[in-house]
């Protein structure tokens, strides 16, 4: 359970219900932690999966790059990935500064497999159920909390196909490595 839910349960404000098995026909999600040097191989894997009819979500911590931060942003990577690595795939972009109408249209297109690769911020953390989406790639994973990473990972693995959550770490500190390996 996530820390907030555990605290509420322990302090008597919520009943405890143990779910000890996965929904029917679902497989466990394979979670991998990789360094940025392996991204070319990861992108090749994504291309292969999307070309076979599956879908992928790629999450970035920022909408736009800033001078104060060395983090990679969703808008810039949307432009880069859709022009280079995924130029032959349908790539979409969604983030919190978009209008509700635009976000709804992007999610409708993604849900109906018109978009193979969805570049996003954490706006997709909850409420997304696309069984055909089998890959979640999270950039700068060390910058997210474990609860957030768990929520994001939960966006894949909702169908009967094997699913993957790939955590890209760009901070190679031992502490961030250990924290991500908990996932």
Annotate each predicted stretch with a short phrase.
Residues 1-182:
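Inter-lobe coupling/hinge segments of SF2-like helicase ATPases
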């Amino acid at each position: 359970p996530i820390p907030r839910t555990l605290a509420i349960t322990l302090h008597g404000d919520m009943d405890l219900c143990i779910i000890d098995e996965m929904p029917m026909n679902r497989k466990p999600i394979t979670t991998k932690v990789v360094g940025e040097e392996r991204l070319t191989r990861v992108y090749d894997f994504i291309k292969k999966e999307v070309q076979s009819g599956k879908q992928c979500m790629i999450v970035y911590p920022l909408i736009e790059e800033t001078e104060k931060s060395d983090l990679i942003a969703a808008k810039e990577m949307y432009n880069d990935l859709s022009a280079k690595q995924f130029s032959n795939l349908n790539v979409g972009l969604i983030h919190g500064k978009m209008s509700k109408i635009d976000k709804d249209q992007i999610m409708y297109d993604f849900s109906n497999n018109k978009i193979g690769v969805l570049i996003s911020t954490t706006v997709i953390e909850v409420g997304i159920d696309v069984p055909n989406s089998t890959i979640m790639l999270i950039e700068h994973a060390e910058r997210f909390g474990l609860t957030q990473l768990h929520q994001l990972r939960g966006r894949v693995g909702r169908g009967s196909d094997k699913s993957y959550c790939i955590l890209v770490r760009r901070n190679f500190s031992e502490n961030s490595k250990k924290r991500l390996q908990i996932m």
